């Protein structure tokens, strides 16, 4: 569908644009520890507690984050 962005990440490393698409889709997903070229994508629960985080350059970052996005991601309306 034109104009739609994925709500999940690729299984491996991900770009800043891919991370921004995910943070735009979910209320509880944030970019933290931003070093410019690398950063962490963080998922927090409704109480703000850390559920999972990965650096964007990790070989299986998306594979680790996607199950948490699917089960604990709070979509924006």
UniProtKB/Swiss-Prot annotation:
InterPro entries: DUF905 (IPR009253), YkfF-like_sf (IPR038612)
Family designation: Belongs to the UPF0401 family.
Protein name: UPF0401 protein ECP_3010
Organism of this sequence: Escherichia coli O6:K15:H31 (strain 536 / UPEC)
């Amino acid at each position: 569908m034109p104009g739609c962005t994925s709500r999940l990440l690729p299984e491996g490393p991900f770009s800043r644009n891919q991370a921004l698409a995910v943070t735009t889709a979910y209320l509880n997903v944030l970019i933290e520890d931003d070093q410019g070229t690398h950063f962490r994508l963080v998922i927090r629960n409704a109480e703000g507690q850390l559920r999972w985080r990965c650096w964007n350059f990790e070989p299986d970052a998306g594979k680790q984050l996607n199950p948490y996005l699917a089960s604990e991601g709070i979509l924006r309306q």
